[in-house]
Amino acid sequence: MAVALHVVDHPLIADSLTRVRDKDTPNALFRQELERIGTLLMAEATRGLPTHAVRVQTPLTETLGRQLTSQPVVVPVLRAGLGFLHAAKDLLPNADVGFIGVAR
């Protein structure tokens, strides 16, 4: 079974990752940058989610919009993945959350 690897080469992620890796980054900034990375990665990871057309009444006219066909389940791998959970819930507020624990 071949595993697909998708490399996200984004300047905003690289910028934040540099601060996350810096030993002198204060805790509050570390958490802020980790959330920023999580938001950008979630946007990329959800790019291919299936959607369907829906009719929407705007203040001026009726038009077609797109909605997610179904909500995905967000599953962070404990403990490192918890840093990305807040960003995932911001983008997918109705998603169920599960957890996976892995021991080294």
Locations of regions flagged by a protein language model:
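PRPP-associated nucleotide enzymes
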Residues: 1-104
